[in-house]
Amino acid sequence: MSRKCELTGVGVLYGNNVSHSQRKTRRRFEPNLRSVKFTSDITAGEYRLSVNARCISSVEKAGGFDAYILKADDNVLSSNARTIKKKIIQTKTAKSL
């Protein structure tokens, strides 16, 4: 399992622990990932994605999972999220016809 958000693309960063004496040791800054089940109003399906905690509030602010994923850029989304986005677009166009 990669340590990367499926909706925002936020991954692991590398840096230093710096002590009081300015001694530097390497460390990893890992994202706060959570496995969350999102429900789509358009497809009426549930999708489990691994997202960071900040992304959860961003999804709520955007007006729900469907609105967020339709606004999201494709090169930031994971392959799983891109297939979900395609399903949402297909069912949205089928319902509008």
UniProtKB/Swiss-Prot annotation:
User: Got a GO cellular component term for this one?
Assistant: ribosome
Q: Per the UniProt entry, what is one GO biological process?
A: translation
Q: Which UniProt keywords apply?
A: Ribonucleoprotein, Ribosomal protein
Family matches, as InterPro entries: Ribosomal_bL28, Ribosomal_bL28/bL31-like_sf, Ribosomal_bL28_bact-type, Ribosomal_bL28_sf
Please give the Gene Ontology molecular function terms for this protein: structural constituent of ribosome
Report the superkingdom from the record: Bacteria
The similarity comment for this entry is:
Belongs to the bacterial ribosomal protein bL28 family.
NCBIfam families found in the cross-reference section: L28
- Name of the featured protein: Large ribosomal subunit protein bL28
Can you name the source organism?
A: Rickettsia felis (strain ATCC VR-1525 / URRWXCal2) (Rickettsia azadi)
Tell me what gene encodes this.
Answer: rpmB
